[in-house]
Amino acid sequence: MSNDRKKKVLITGGYGFIGSSFIRNLSKNENYIIGNIDKLTYSSNLNSLEKVTNKNNYTFFQEDICNKESIREIIFSFEPNYIIHLAAETHVDRSIDGPEVFLKTNILGTYNLLNSSKEYYEKINGQDNKDFKFLLVSTDEVYGSLETNQEKFT
């Protein structure tokens, strides 16, 4: 990789609500090459990226972030400048009924991404190494509920 090339952004969970919005906006800028990793689960919306899928700066990888070998292969072959991790099991009520899939995806999947990203980061040199970023996007659910008598915060 070199600085005169377009920046490559690898996004997980790109067919989700936030991920698809991010990709639609980012795809308008031809200075970015976009990779989208998504397992395509119940919360994926294939229609959300219908105007993006045929663009030259977009590639889709249907994969589970829990598949360590595939995730490593995607990262090393795509050679991203930035990884934006949005993939997660959502809907708190579902986590109460079946926590295993939440633990697997949200913890093990994130761990796999971090390990492969670290390995990739240690491989790249020069400015690409200095510019590389890994961004984890979470949810407001991690803060818990705000009681009605508590002061609001942002």
Regions of interest found by a model, annotated:
Residues 1-154:
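N-terminal Rossmann-like NAD(P)+-binding domain of SDR-like oxidoreductases, especially those catalyzing
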